[in-house]
Amino acid sequence: AFAQGQSTIQSWDFNSGIPTGWTQSTNATDGGFGAGSASSLSSQYFTITDPGSNIVATNDDDCNCDKADEYLITDTLDLSNYSVLHATFKSFYYGATYSGSTESAEFLYTTNGGTTWTSLAVLTPAADWTSQWIDVSAACGNSNVQFAFNYQDAGGWLYGLGIDDFSIFAPYNFDLAAESLDLFSTVGLNNAPFTLEGTITNYGGTTITSMDLNYKIDNGTTVTQSLTGLSIAPYQTYTYSHGTSWNPSSTGTYTVDVWASSLNGGNDQN
């Protein structure tokens, strides 16, 4: 369910460096974002995990220079024929605080060559590479769109930002994925019945207002609960709790499958 949508508009893996036509805006003495292996762009305190391919990154720890407002900007994209588009990329970004300064990172777009920028998302910090999924439909309908990664060190000596595997794509309308099932791998029969709980994320382009929540034990009968009155926006995660508990009759090894169907009355397209 993590497959990108029906068509990829543009994608960049950075294996050949910073793409032709991309530009930067930086006051840093090291030139801003660089391209290369994770090890070549790392430093003592900003050690980037190797994702197995080249990346782009800006390293404030190594430079300790002015990275107060740094932009890595794509070339111009014609999105005039699109109404719904999403972006995905991997980021390596701590979002840390040091000596009273907190670093920040955003994903933005412009339709006027960078005179003004509109924020699409504040990047989610993590201790390692993490996938960012962003609705960029606000940029659709324009023929001169540029996206940008913005890093700010708030005037301090912080860490940095790494980016890899960046794509702009048209999503499926309906694409819901069960992310987790909060059930121990080993449970005691004396604790039955068990409530099946977990999370589901909407990777489609449409807000989900109703769905069937299903589970099946091994090759048994599907147990379905119809849910209405929902509002699961694109890239929002929903915590579910199935209304029908599972009550195994004997000890053993079981396979539990959980999925959603009948999304707004239609089918999951992925």
Which residues make up each language-model segment?
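Conserved Ser/Thr-centered positions that define the repeating blades of beta-propeller domains
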Residues: 107-111, 216
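Short beta-strands within extracellular/lumenal beta-sheet-rich domains
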Residues: 64-82, 130-133
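Extracellular glycan-recognition surfaces and repeat-rich motifs
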Residues: 5-63, 100-102
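Extracellular beta-rich ligand/substrate-recognition surface
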Residues: 58-70, 122-127
